[in-house]
Amino acid sequence: MTSHDQSYRAGEAKGRTEEKTNQMIGNIEDKAQAAKEKAQQAAQTAKDKTSQTAQAAKEKTQQTAQAAKDKTQQTTQATKEKAQDTTGRAKEKGSEMGQSTKETAQSGKDNSAGFLQQTGEKAKGMAQGATDAVKQTFGMTNDDQDKDHFPTNRH
């Protein structure tokens, strides 16, 4: 029986060894699977984090670009309004100056006309006086006319 016992014990030892080996292989496979899953989770987490960071950067860039665009439009509009206002005021000032110049010219024209009329009347009066003086000097005057222009005490 010894050989049978030895054979039995050897079979038992072999069975236990196989069982332990299978357990160890199972444990190693479980640990390898867990490590694989953990690595996949870490990779997915890193991928998600990278994607989120990229999306946040994209949104921030879009917001910054939109803010710059809005600011540029506001500045452009303000500049346009300022230019229109300045142009309007310049036109208004030019119109006022033109009207003032027109009024000044009209006043000068009126003054010149009045001055020329007065000068003409004075020259006419002086010429008439000179004519009358010459006529009287040469005795060519009518006595009735002389009374009006050269009153004397001849009554």
Swiss-Prot record:
Domain of life, source organism: Eukaryota
Statement: the UniProt record of this protein carries the keyword Repeat: yes
Description of what induces expression: Up-regulated in response to water stress.
Compositionally biased spans, kind Basic and acidic residues: 11-21, 28-39, 79-95, 144-155
Gene3D superfamilies: Apolipoprotein (1.20.120.20)
Bias type Polar residues, positions: 97-120
Keywords per UniProt: Repeat
Sequence repeats: 53-63, 64-74
Region of interest (Disordered), residue spans: 1-155
Comp. bias regions, Low complexity: 40-78
Region (2 X 11 AA approximate tandem repeats of T-A-Q-A-A-K-E-K-T-Q-Q): 53-74
Organs and tissues of expression: Highest expression is found in seeds. No expression detected in adult tissues.
PANTHER family (UniProt xref): LATE EMBRYOGENESIS ABUNDANT PROTEIN (LEA) FAMILY PROTEIN (PTHR34191:SF20)
Family of the protein in this entry: Belongs to the LEA type 4 family.
Name of this chain's protein: Late embryogenesis abundant protein 2
Source organism of this protein record: Cicer arietinum
Lineage, top ranks: Eukaryota, Viridiplantae, Streptophyta, Embryophyta, Tracheophyta
